[in-house]
Amino acid sequence: MPIRARIIGIDPGLRFTGFGIIEADGNRLRHVADGVIATDGAAAVAERLHTLDAALARLLATYAPDHAAVEETYVNRNATATLKLGYARGVALLAPARAGIAVAEYGAKTVKRAVVGTGAAEKDQVALMVRRLLPGAAITRADAADALAVAICHAHHLATASRVPAA
């Protein structure tokens, strides 16, 4: 059975969180919205997380997605930066779950493989393929392109799961 779903993809970050909303109808994908949620870098971490949570709640209420997909956190050498990214990711996971929306998680290589065909793709290759898969989308920020890629990855996984018979 072909899938029909509205999906929000989220690329979490404490300073900038990208979001992308698509509709999947069978093999066709349609761009709905995308953008970036920015927090004040001078504000306390708790205030920034509150800003992120409130913005995600508004997006979820406005666009009413059926599914959410969040990119997994990569660990870098700066432990403090990794922890802060983890805080933002926690909010990105909690907001849709609190709204009763199923949340999937995908690593960067899985997203790249689903969108470009290789897990070693560069960011500009991912953005180019997102634009090809979503014609007419005027994507202006890399974070938004990444979030749309996460949503596309989830759409592909939903489509595959719908074709595989249950055991």
Curated annotation (Swiss-Prot):
Homodimer which binds Holliday junction (HJ) DNA. The HJ becomes 2-fold symmetrical on binding to RuvC with unstacked arms; it has a different conformation from HJ DNA in complex with RuvA. In the full resolvosome a probable DNA-RuvA(4)-RuvB(12)-RuvC(2) complex forms which resolves the HJ. Keywords: Cytoplasm, DNA damage, DNA recombination, DNA repair, DNA-binding, Endonuclease, Hydrolase, Magnesium, Metal-binding, Nuclease. CDD domains: RuvC. It catalyses: Endonucleolytic cleavage at a junction such as a reciprocal single-stranded crossover between two homologous DNA duplexes (Holliday junction). This is Crossover junction endodeoxyribonuclease RuvC. InterPro entries: RNaseH-like_sf (IPR012337), RNaseH_sf (IPR036397), X-over_junc_endoDNase_Mg_BS (IPR020563), X-over_junc_endoDNase_RuvC (IPR002176). It is found in: Cytoplasm. It comes from the Bacteria. Binds 2 Mg(2+) ion per subunit. The gene is ruvC. NCBIfam families: ruvC. GO terms for biological process: DNA recombination; DNA repair. It comes from Acidiphilium cryptum (strain JF-5).
